[in-house]
From Swiss-Prot:
The lineage of its organism: Eukaryota, Viridiplantae, Streptophyta, Embryophyta, Tracheophyta. Expressed only in the proximal meristematic zone of the root. PPPase is active in the presence of Mg(2+) ions, while no activity is observed in the presence of manganese ions. Its cofactor is Mg(2+); Mn(2+); Co(2+). Involved in the hydrolysis of the beta-gamma-phosphoanhydride linkage of triphosphate-containing substrates (inorganic or nucleoside-linked). Catalyzes the hydrolysis of inorganic triphosphate (PPPi), however it does not display significant activity towards long-chain polyphosphates. The existence of PPPi in living cells is still unclear, and PPPase activity might be the ancestral function of CYTH domain. It also has gamma-phosphatase activity on NTP substrates, but no adenylate cyclase or RNA triphosphatase activity. It comes from Arabidopsis thaliana (Mouse-ear cress). Residues 1-208 form the CYTH domain. GO terms for molecular function: ATP binding; ATP hydrolysis activity; inorganic triphosphate phosphatase activity. The keyword Nucleotide-binding applies. Pfam families: CYTH. GO terms for cellular component: anaphase-promoting complex; cytoplasm; nucleus. It is found in: Nucleus. The gene is TTM3. This is Triphosphate tunnel metalloenzyme 3. Inhibited by 2.5 mM Ca(2+).
Length: 210
């Protein structure tokens, strides 16, 4: 079970102010492309499951020796998001980047990957293969990661086709305590925020900003 604090930054200015204040604690910047798959009848979504390929690259590595791009396949199931605290069952593993790219162009190729996560999707949701699956599209996400007050903060700028959203995420085993700590800091620094009440996937599927 993945447990995260999720707080939405209300404006681009709030995002800029926060990332500026956190500069001394910066670890890395990740450029991510999140792409989703389901059947034409949304069989996974109807059962509160999400199948995602995440393509990412670490922009903090020097230009002289750039990090290779990576691809992570993940299954998220039974999510809840209440009072800015998210709980979701998540299973993920890395696959070859080029194979992931091929699956975006031809989702049926998901059937050819010897992936533990994809095998679980078939077994738990009753699919023989992925021949009927379609690519739903996705969105870009720029994630700045910080080591701050004993926790790892992830500050996201998510770029949908219909606009941008800004969010703080923090995975923790003490969500209430960590949420209070972050909220007090944001309030003290006059950074506008609210509890996140929709996942990024839900925003993407809604086609409009929250």
């Amino acid at each position: 079970m993945e447990v995260e604090v999720k707080l939405r930054l209300l404006t681009a200015a709030a995002h800029l102010r926060l990332t500026t204040l956190l500069t001394p604690y910066h670890l890395k910047t990740l450029h991510q492309r999140n792409t989703f798959f389901d059947t034409p009848k949304n069989d996974l979504s109807l059962r509160r499951a999400v199948l995602r390929l995440r393509f990412l690259q670490n922009a903090a590595v020097s230009a002289a020796s750039p990090s290779p791009p990576r691809c992570i396949v993940s299954l998220k199931a039974k999510p809840t998001l209440a009072n800015g605290i998210s709980r979701v069952e998540e299973d993920e593993e890395e696959i070859e980047y080029w194979i992931g790219k091929e699956c975006v162009e031809s989702p049926a190729k998901l059937s050819d990957i010897g992936s533990r996560v994809l095998k679980r999707v078939k077994e738990e949701y009753g699919f023989n293969d992925f021949l009927g699956f379609v690519c739903l599209g996705g969105f870009e996400n720029v994630r700045n990661v910080y080591e701050w007050r004993g926790v790892k903060l992830e500050v996201d700028e998510t770029k949908y086709d219909f606009g941008n959203c800004y969010e703080i995420e923090c995975e923790t085993e003490e969500p209430e305590r960590v949420k209070t700590m972050i909220e007090e800091f944001l309030t003290e620094e006059k950074i506008e925020f609210s509890n996140s009440d929709m996942t990024k996937f839900a925003v993407f599927r809604s086609g409009k900003l929250p």
